[in-house]
Amino acid sequence: MRLLWKLVILLPLINSCAGEGRFSRPIFIQEPQDVIFPLDLSRSEIILTCTANGYPSPHYRWKQNGTDIDFGMTYHYRLDGGSLAISSPRTDQDIGIYQCLATNPVGTILSRKAKLQFAYIEDFETKTRSTVSVREGQGVVLLCGPPPHFGELSYAWTFNDSPLYVQEDKRRFVSQDTGNLYFAKVEPSDVGNYTCFVTNKEAHRSVQGPPTPLVLRTDGVMGEYEPKIEVRFPETIQAAKDSSIKLECFALGNPVPDISWKRLDGSPMPGKIKYSKSQAILEIPKFQQEDEGFYECIAGNLRGRNLAKGQLIFYAPPEWEQKIQNTYLSIYDSLFWECKASGNPNPSYTWLKNGQRLNTEERIQIENGTLIITMLNISDSGIYQCAAENKYQTIYANAELRVLASAPDFSKNPIKKISVVQVGGDISIECKPNAFPKASISWKRGTENLKQSKRVLFLEDGSLKICNVTRADAGSYTCVATNQFGNGKSSGGLVVKERTIITVPPSKMDVTVGESIVLPCQVSHDPTMEVLFVWYFNGDIIDLKKGVAHFERIGGESVGDLMIRNIQLGHSGKYLCTVQTTLERLSAVADIIVRGPPGPPEDVKVEHISSTTSQLSWRPGPDNNSPIQIFTIQTRTPFSVGWQAVATVPEILNGQTYNATVVGLSPWVEYEFRVVAGNNIGIGEPSKPSELLRTKASVPNVAPGNINGGGGSRSELVITWEAIPEELQNGEGFGYIVMFRPVGTTAWMKERVALVESSKFIYRNESIMPLSPFEVKVGVYNNEGEGSLSTVTIVYSGEDEPQLAPRGTSVQSFSASEMEVSWNAIAWNRNTGRVLGYEVLYWTDNSKESMIGKIRVSGNVTTKNITGLRANTIYFASVRAYNTAGTGPSSLPVNVTTKKSPPSQPPANIAWKLSNSKLCLNWEHVKTMENESEVLGYKILYRQNRQSKTHILETNNTSAELLVPFEEDYLIEIRTVSDGGDGSSSEEIRIPKMSSLSSTGVQISKPSTQSLSMVGVFYCFAIHPLSR
């Protein structure tokens, strides 16, 4: 009873401190580590680090060799934060084991143990060392004998005054265990003084011993002898986990012994093992359990062998496998803690509370790594440590035990203010006050105590569960919690909503690629609740906010229909519509099958190929939900334009046919094949092409066409044809066979033309008469044989040039730029040469040969008009006949002088008068220059404004009268006429159409500029009359 009252008094403190969790235990973030300190006067202070977190901040204590350090009694030790500073350290006073303790109101923790040692090495004694005398070929050991020291040493030797260390090899070895220098067999070059150098790495100091002289004895050379092992490793070695182990083995002997190693249990040497150059050192890095066992060193030479062996024993300091964790328990509960650590040897366990060792007593049971405390009370709160220890190390696991005692409290975990449930659903209202020990729970609805029933259940954890909720269950509910320290209560409301129902779910659909569909998803729900629609496709959410292609949500608040536009094959699958409210999640699923053209067939193979056929096989691709009904085979060659459908056997390839023979191929052509599948929906994508293969060769079966020829020189027969394209040549070694014979004979002459590109053959024979007819046919051949021949065609041999010149040649000038040449036709025969036409040559006196004009006319034409000549110039002309062989002799030249140039000045001062449909024109006579032809008359050119047809009126006078209907504007110009041709035209005059009024006009032109200078209206009588 006294304890109960004490707890009541302590409750405020417990709640504000432990219960509220404001205090936190110390946790080390830095612990002291082992230190080997160099004994050097320049180093005046040692720092052993120790830092811990916690609230309030911990204070620190230190132990040396298990005894508390009293910082008030000496300045030698001081606290630096939580770290220990040792000033002017001394070996006799400060060497030992140190531990840091961190304490706050929650408790105390003890750090790992840290060892402080001092590294040093003294000087060698200065006395002279004795001379070592040996025979040549004998083995010898030079002792180093290091001075007193602490810390790891390394050894090296020098020879005479050389600054370089003696290099180790199969004959010489420096032991890093003893420092001694070993010679397996002494040679004359070894004679001299040897000095041992010793370095202490931790003390940062090296010392040098006195020299040891080595001399050779004079009483002979040492004979051969078997190896004697002088450097051997211990029989038993303790090897720590992950450490690097080195075993030394060296032997004296003559000849120099070879060193080798093995494991006595027959296991292979680990691959990680390293050897020194001489094999005298075996190193095992990162030593593990599987590396332990017996190792043997073998030293051998021609005289025998010797052995050394030892055992490596694996050990490991403790490592945690299971640590203890912070635990918060109610008063009178029981504590069970267990910690486990691995190690070799197995560790033992010790338990500590606030840095003090725990022992078994009435309520406390300790067995190996387990701790049990029954009937917990407040005084059991604190920091506990499990220490796992073997002879190599001690490790600590730390945790806090907090024992709690309080009346029920809802401040941190009150009843939910509003709980919402749907009609027909189940609801659980949690009641979890903080109470130590656990409180008993009762419930009220409104002001009435609630009793259990089939629908109303009180759960073990204190929660209230109501099943198959109705509207009448809505209201206020209160949880009342009680323990020996007091009671507490908390209330919340229950709101009941109508259920949500999917009224129109999506249903299974069969659609075709490219269509658009709507999947319905419509619900009825409580009007006070928001509804969220989410669609899934094959398990993945459709994110409509990102504007995913094809998908669109349509509908209002209670409608979540999904539209799929331009549906594709990849849209086949399961569509899940989920409807979410704050209370529940409903879903409905539908399968959508999208049918489309078949996928591309696969694995198209050419099983066999001949000259005109190919056997193919393939595997069907996906039918895309519509059975394949037909296959089509297509081919492509280097000569085709794209892919072409081909004939097959069988002719129709139904959807169950997966092989066929392609027929009608061209021999000796490279083909690719592909297969296309079709179904009710359409034609699918083609397969990948097969490998490129060439059909077998065959005799060519297409004869050349368009057999022709003729021409060429005398005694030549020229034969031409259309070349056969490569795809019809049917094989290698392709060429042409040309066969011909004179008409009326029976024997064929036969020639081969090996050039594939050739389309012409010329046969020469002096006996061939001009224009002799020949029967000609052309065939083809290749390495497989001769193929088809063309039909017979008549081709004439070459002919002679015409032998006769034309007679009766004459020439006449028509204008300043035109003349006409005439001649008599030649009556030709086979002897005088065939005439196909005539060639007219013309030139001037000073024409160069390259400037001679040539014009040809064909057939029996005997005149030729030549234009584009120069005015007032003498031209010469002659005529000659031509045929396919060339041109014949020219006629005698004739000449003519072209007319002078036509007048250069146009008619000027043109006046006009328009009356009804009569137009009166008047202009000045044109005067010509000396080098121009005389004016013989004038041409009047007129046309309606919107028409292209021009009318011409010629006159010898300087006036004219035109009768024209003037429904539209007229355009008029006037030019001169002379022997030299038409002269320059006046500027175009526009005569406007007139409806009722008469009008007159004048155009004044300067002869030099021909520009319009004035337009006016005048009376016709002022310039009259047009007729004389």
Curated annotation (Swiss-Prot):
- Annotated keywords: Cell adhesion, Cell membrane, Disulfide bond, Glycoprotein, GPI-anchor, Immunoglobulin domain, Lipoprotein, Membrane, Notch signaling pathway, Phosphoprotein, Repeat, Signal
Q: Which Pfam families does the entry link to?
A: fn3, I-set, Ig_3
Organism (species): Mus musculus
Specify the Ig-like C2-type domain's residue ranges.
Answer: 32-117, 122-208, 227-308, 318-402, 408-502, 500-587
Instruction: Give the sites modified to Phosphotyrosine.
Output: 882
Q: Which residues form the propeptide?
A: 1000-1028
| Lipidation feature positions (GPI-anchor amidated serine) | 999
PROSITE patterns referenced in this protein's UniProt entry, alphabetically: FN3, IG_LIKE
Q: What cystine pairs are annotated?
A: 50-100, 144-196, 249-297, 339-386, 431-479, 521-577
Family, as annotated? Belongs to the immunoglobulin superfamily. Contactin family.
> What is the name listed in the Swiss-Prot or TrEMBL entry for this protein?
Contactin-6
Any GO CC annotation of this UniProt entry: plasma membrane
Keyword Ribonucleoprotein part of the UniProt annotation: no
Question: Where does this protein reside within or beyond the cell?
Answer: Cell membrane
* Oligomeric form and interacting partners: Interacts with PTPRG.
Q: Which residues are the signal sequence here?
A: 1-19
* Zinc recorded as keyword: no
Read off the InterPro entries from this record: FN3_dom, FN3_sf, Ig-like_dom, Ig-like_dom_sf, Ig-like_fold, Ig_I-set, Ig_sub, Ig_sub2
